[in-house]
Amino acid sequence: MNASDLWNKSLDILSRREHSVIELKNKLIRFNPDPNDLKDVIERLITSNFLDDKRFASAFIRSKAESGYGPNYISQYLSKKGISSDKYDMYSLEIDWEEKCLAQFNKKRRNKEINFKEKEKILRFLAYRGFSYEIIKNALKEFD
């Protein structure tokens, strides 16, 4: 696959969803392992504004927050995808993390009374979903 085909393939991949630079490199390397072609295409995508780690991070954060994940989970996943924390600000996107946490809590408890053991189980679930202790504590003040 030459550089032109690699360019077209990368546009095809990016037309489906946002990707990080590292994520796209890993996908494209299967089609053309030549590092020079790959580097040229990636640089061209970045300068053409087709590929942007900040835009990817913002879209990813919004998507995962809407799916009920907390900031700790999201930042850990982004670092796995090669996005450094200086590329995004989790708290500048006007996401109410306490509201998201409370929504997940209510979804788990199904609007019924719960005992201490069930509450602890839900709190562990919320921590697993990436909500910090502080967010959980603030979101669930009314249930103490």
Give the ranges of each region predicted by the language model.
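An alpha-helical, amphipathic repeat domain used for nucleic-acid recognition
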Residues: M1-D144
